[in-house]
Curated annotation (Swiss-Prot):
It comes from Eremothecium gossypii (strain ATCC 10895 / CBS 109.51 / FGSC 9923 / NRRL Y-1056). The gene is VMA9. This is V-type proton ATPase subunit e. Keywords: Hydrogen ion transport, Ion transport, Membrane, Transmembrane, Transmembrane helix, Transport, Vacuole. The chain crosses the membrane at residues 3-23, 35-55. Residues 1-2, 56-72 are lumenal. Its main location: membrane. GO terms for molecular function: proton-transporting ATPase activity, rotational mechanism. It is found in: Vacuole membrane. Belongs to the V-ATPase e1/e2 subunit family.
Length: 72
């Protein structure tokens, strides 16, 4: 669980996009390419933002189930 996971996923999305660029169906090829590649890139961006925000939260979570004398 680190930044390398994001890099590895990015490289796999780039590889899948390159494969689909070559193997796209011949009729409406431009539509297929742009639809699939844009969909994969936007899903990667949403996943990466969510994953990285969970790794490095802006607000530190607090436990609410502690007794007051043990709470900080």
């Amino acid at each position: 669980m680190s930044f390398y996971t994001v890099v590895a996923t990015f490289l796999s999305v780039v590889l899948a996009s390159a494969v689909f660029w070559v193997l796209a169906p011949k009729e409406n090829q431009t539509v297929w390419r742009s639809t699939i590649i844009l969909s994969m890139s936007m899903m990667f961006l949403m996943w990466a933002v969510t994953y990285l925000s969970q790794l490095h939260p802006l607000v530190v979570p607090r436990r609410s189930d502690l007794r007051p004398e043990f709470a900080e």
